Amino acid sequence: MTTRGLEDLDGGLGSCLPSDDLPFLEEPASGRRRESKARGTSRRADSSDWTHVLQDPVAAGAGDAGLKKMEKELAGKESTAGKAGTSPRIVPARRKPQAPPPLQPPPPPLQPPPRTPSDDLPWGDLTLNKCLVLASLVALLGSALQLCRDAVAGEVVAAPHPWVPPSSPPKKEASPAPKPPVLVSPSGSPQPKPGPPQARMQDEPELPGSPEATETRVERGGSISEASGEESVPLGDRGSQEKPRKEKPSKGEKLKKEKPRREKPRREDKSQVTGEPRQSLPRRWEAREGGRRPWGRDSRDLLEHGKLQAWAPRRRHDRDDRPRQKRGKGRD
């Protein structure tokens, strides 16, 4: 009852609070008017509350609850009215056209990191393939230059000369052998026919006991002594004379003397060495003249002149005539 009476009184008294049915009657008010209205309503409510409390103390508890409820309703109405009154009057502010942001300059390029001394080396970027290509190019250039040089110079490879062995020194011709002296028989036998002396000497077999052999030996001994130029001197005179010093021949003379000896070895018949008689072979003159030697001696001549023995040595007269020295005890 109390709440209805208050509502009726409020409505009859002509409250200035806007109702929900007439929102357009709401006047625009500033914040101060709203605050005054809220204060006036609160005062009226307080005064009415005090009157109700005084009139009916029994119903005080119920009135407190109703007051609270009314306060809530009034607060809700005020909030809705404030929203409705302010919403149409709010004019959006004109936004000024914003100038476009200034264009930013492009970022500077990134600088490469500082190089270390190892990166500055010339072979820093070289690889194995690059080295191989470079070496092949250098080899090709070298071969091309060599070919050009050979073509310009016109060098021609000479054909290899055949190898010639060194010529041996010419051999010296051996001196001709001296001719042996021609034998002349004491008797008037016919002389032998002219022919090569060596063939004659080989054809004539000399007997060991014949005087021809002795004469040939004597002549050979005499020729050797004459060639050497040494004179026979008695033994007594030899002792008084000083022995001449032998001069050593030079090497060239020795070689000259030894060469003819080597080239002319002396031939000795086997028959003379062994002492056997040499068998005579058939000769041409034997076939022509019936086997008789034209220069051979008869058996008579051999008996007359063959008394000398072949083995007996020839006695030298100078040794027999010289006085023999008596051997003393070494005293003068």
Swiss-Prot record:
GO annotation terms (biological process): protein localization to membrane; skeletal muscle contraction
The keyword Cytoplasm appears for this protein: no
Gene Ontology CC terms, in alphabetical order: sarcoplasmic reticulum; sarcoplasmic reticulum membrane
Positions of the UniProt region annotated as Mediates interaction with CACNA1S: 1-80
InterPro entries, sorted: JSRP1
Tissues showing expression: Specifically expressed in skeletal muscle. Detected in skeletal muscle and tongue (at protein level).
Keywords: Endoplasmic reticulum, Membrane, Phosphoprotein, Sarcoplasmic reticulum
Subunit relationships: Interacts with CACNA1S, CACNB1 and calsequestrin.
Protein name: Junctional sarcoplasmic reticulum protein 1
Organismal lineage: Eukaryota, Metazoa, Chordata, Craniata, Vertebrata
Originating gene: Jsrp1
